Each structure stands twice: as C-alpha cells, then as structure tokens.
C-alpha cells in the first residue's frame, strides 16, 4: 500500500508519546531466526542473552509469579528496533502466544518515564496489566498491557533508568532488499472505524482519511496467480518512526481477506520501500519466498508485492515501489 503523509495533532497519547520504537517477534529458534534477520537487515548476527532468573527478573504473569525466562536478541534499524524472543516453557505471555498463535509479532513498545504513572491510564481505558518484570542487563522494568481486542496486538511499556541502546551497528553489509528501513506495520481488521478510533486514541492523533481501493483496471490486483478486484478500505497513521496501516478487506479474494478468515484480526505485514521491484521479487522467489499478491497503488503512483516470508521472518514482507522514484 502507498505511504501517505498525515500530520499529527496535539492530542495526548496514552503512553505520553506516540513513538512506537520496537516490533517484537516470538520465535521457536532464536539462533536460526537471528541469522536470517541479520541477513535481511545487513548487519552482523548479534548474540542472544538469557533473561535473569526469578530473583532478578521478578516476572509476574496474570497476577502470579513465574519462572518465565527468555533468550533475547535486539536488532536496530533506521526506524524501529526488532526484538526476537525465544521463551522457556514456564508460564508467560510469550509462551502463551507461541502455544496458541505461533511465531510472529507479539507486541509493539513505547518508552515511558514512569510505568507507575502510565499503567493506570491504560487500565482506566480498559487495558489491564498482563505481565510485568525487571530488566536483566540494565536498570529498568516493563509491563505488557492487554490491548489485543482493540489494537490487535499487545503493547509493552518500557521504563529505563538510562536511554536504551538504539544505535545501529557500525559494521554493516548490503541489506537483502537494498534497504533496512522498516516503513510500515500493517494490521488487518474487521471494523476499520473501530480500530482507527482505538489507534488514534492510543497515539493521540486525529482520524486520518479512509481510502477506498481503486478501480480494478488501475490497481490490477493479482492474488495467488489470479486477477481479483481485491477490494478493501484502509487508512494510514503516521508516528515518528513507523507508519501504521489498518486494512478492512472487502468481499473479493485477497491476501487480507484470507488472513482475516484464517488467522483473524492482527498483524498482516511489514513494509520496505525498494527499487527495482521485478529484481527484488525474483531474488526472494529464488530464496524460496513466493509472491502472494501484487497490485498498483490506488492512485496509480506505485506498486506493491506481498512475499510469503512467514516461515523464516514470521511475518509477510511487503515490497513498495514508487513510480516516481
């Protein structure tokens, strides 16, 4: 989908800011997955570390102390930070996600000055505390709030005594797609207006314009090898680092409709703006990542391709190419 510019307003975000700084993936094999993500982003493979035991981490899940521990890897990009999480078998939100949903994006994160101040705001808005804990390698703490119903993903609040390390690796290689800048996080929803209201309240912004998919002779959507109208309506919400896209599928076949029918509401893809679309599609197909759907922007100013990268990257990757670039 095309990326639009939408100004932010002065409404107050629930977390005190609207900077989504992290996309966190729960995975079965952090060693293998971190190697794949390092190649995608063009950085050296970082080493994972194990979170502390219960005396250090003090994890409480659904109001009960737990010995939940996880292997973690952090990878910085020009926009958001990727976090990879391999949980142990003890009760915890990541273990629960892996057992019930499978691998994928578990949460988005915001930095806050004080969890003690911000958590009650979320709770007053109907988002209860799900899990809390202390950082292992630095002075800080986190909480997960249960925003799944409204935001289709969980939200983490991070409180750090010192600024977290978000600097990109000084040693870098050519990213797989020619860029490592994540542009979008896209979420498929049943009710666009309701989801938009929830996100705009979370982020402290006015509701953006709803966009209807363009005529099929312009968009030329092909889904799983067959032409389709691929109708939908959607909108874009800009944040400082990442754009949120909310998509409500129409009745005709499309990747969004299939996702909604198969997996329900939730994260559908992340996006990268690239050049030489045909070359990138060929590269990914040769690596074993087939095309799911292609089409043109609703306004005819670019095109997109969804690649089936879920096995390795735990989410669909969308390639975006602007015709004026």
Describe the residue ranges of each PLM region:
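N-terminal beta-strand motif that seeds the catalytic metal site of vicinal oxygen chelate
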Residues: 2-32, 40-42, 103-110, 163-196, ...
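Residues within well-ordered alpha-helices
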Residues: 33-34, 71, 118, 195-196, ...
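Conserved active-site tyrosine of GNAT-family acetyltransferases
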Residues: 36-38, 95, 122, 198-200, ...
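Conserved acetyl-CoA-binding loop of GNAT-fold acetyltransferases
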Residues: 40-43, 126-128, 201-206, 287-290
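Short consensus segments that form the blades of beta-propeller domains
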Residues: 63, 99, 175-176, 261
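Long, charged/polar, surface-exposed segments that mediate recognition or autoinhibition
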Residues: 90-119, 256-282
């Amino acid at each position: 989908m095309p990326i639009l510019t939408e100004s932010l307003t002065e409404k107050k975000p629930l977390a005190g800011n609207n900077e989504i700084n992290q996309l966190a993936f729960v995975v079965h094999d952090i060693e293998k997955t971190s190697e794949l993500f390092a190649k995608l982003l063009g950085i050296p493979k970082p080493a994972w570390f194990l979170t502390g035991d219960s005396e250090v981490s003090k994890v409480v899940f659904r109001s009960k102390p737990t010995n939940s521990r996880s292997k973690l890897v952090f990878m910085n990009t020009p926009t958001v930070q990727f976090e990879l999480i391999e949980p142990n078998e003890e009760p915890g939100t990541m273990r629960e996600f892996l057992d019930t949903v499978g691998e994928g994006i578990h949460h988005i994160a915001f930095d806050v000055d004080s969890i003690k101040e911000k958590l009650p705001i979320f709770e007053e808005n109907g988002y209860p505390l799900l899990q809390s804990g202390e950082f292992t390698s630095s002075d800080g703490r986190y909480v997960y709030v249960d925003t799944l119903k409204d935001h289709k993903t969980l939200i983490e609040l991070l409180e750090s005594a010192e600024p977290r390390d978000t600097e990109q690796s000084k040693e870098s290689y050519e990213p797989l797609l020619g860029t490592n800048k994540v542009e979008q996080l896209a979420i498929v929803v049943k009710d666009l207006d309701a989801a938009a209201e929830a996100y705009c309240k979370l982020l402290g912004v006015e509701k953006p314009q709803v966009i209807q998919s363009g005529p099929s002779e312009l968009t030329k959507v092909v889904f799983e090898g067959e032409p389709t109208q691929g109708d939908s309506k959607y909108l874009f919400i800009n944040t400082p680092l990442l754009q949120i896209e909310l998509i409500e599928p129409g009745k005709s076949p499309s990747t969004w409709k299939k996702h909604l029918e198969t997996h329900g509401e939730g994260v559908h893809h992340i996006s990268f703006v690239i050049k030489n679309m045909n070359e990138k599609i060929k590269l990914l197909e040769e690596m074993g990542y087939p095309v799911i759907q292609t089409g043109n922007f609703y306004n005819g100013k670019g095109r997109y391709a969804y690649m089936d990268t879920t096995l390795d990257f735990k989410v669909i990757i969308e390639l975006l190419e602007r015709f004026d670039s």
